[in-house]
Amino acid sequence: MINNVGIDIVENKRIKLKKEFIIKVLSTNEIQTFNTKTKKQKKEFLAGRWAVKEAIIKTLDQAISMNKIDIEYVNQKPVIQNKELQNILISISHEKKYAIGIALKQSDNK
């Protein structure tokens, strides 16, 4: 059962490729992936992570730093790797100038 929903959209041009911002948003594992991308891909990657992590945070009862949330692709789908957040389903989408993230938090009661 879904008990909370978060959604966020960001315009890619608002994303700055500054070290401080990258460290604020991305986990250590995500930074490794980020570093393999072209400049355009980096902006899109960072925008997507920002949007989906904002969406995740909106579903939570307590604050968490963005860089503590680790997302990897499994079977071509984004999956939160943090054990304590695995009850949250996510999706990231890109459309021309925008990235959007959605998070659906499932209740522990089935």
Swiss-Prot record:
InterPro entries: 4-PPantetheinyl_Trfase_dom (IPR008278), 4-PPantetheinyl_Trfase_dom_sf (IPR037143), ACPS (IPR002582), Ppantetheine-prot_Trfase_dom (IPR004568)
Residues binding Mg(2+): 8, 54
GO molecular function: holo-[acyl-carrier-protein] synthase activity; magnesium ion binding
Cell compartment(s), UniProt: Cytoplasm
Chemical reaction(s) catalysed: apo-[ACP] + CoA = holo-[ACP] + adenosine 3',5'-bisphosphate + H(+)
Name used for this protein in its record: Holo-[acyl-carrier-protein] synthase
Keywords: Cytoplasm, Fatty acid biosynthesis, Fatty acid metabolism, Lipid biosynthesis, Lipid metabolism, Magnesium, Metal-binding, Transferase
Pfam family, one: ACPS
Gene3D superfamilies, alphabetized: 4'-phosphopantetheinyl transferase domain
EC nos: 2.7.8.7
Family the UniProt entry places it in: Belongs to the P-Pant transferase superfamily. AcpS family.
Its job: Transfers the 4'-phosphopantetheine moiety from coenzyme A to a Ser of acyl-carrier-protein.
Any one of the GO BP annotations: fatty acid biosynthetic process
Source organism per UniProt: Mycoplasma mycoides subsp. mycoides SC (strain CCUG 32753 / NCTC 10114 / PG1)
GO CC annotation, single: cytoplasm
Keyword presence, Iron: no
Essential cofactor(s): Mg(2+)
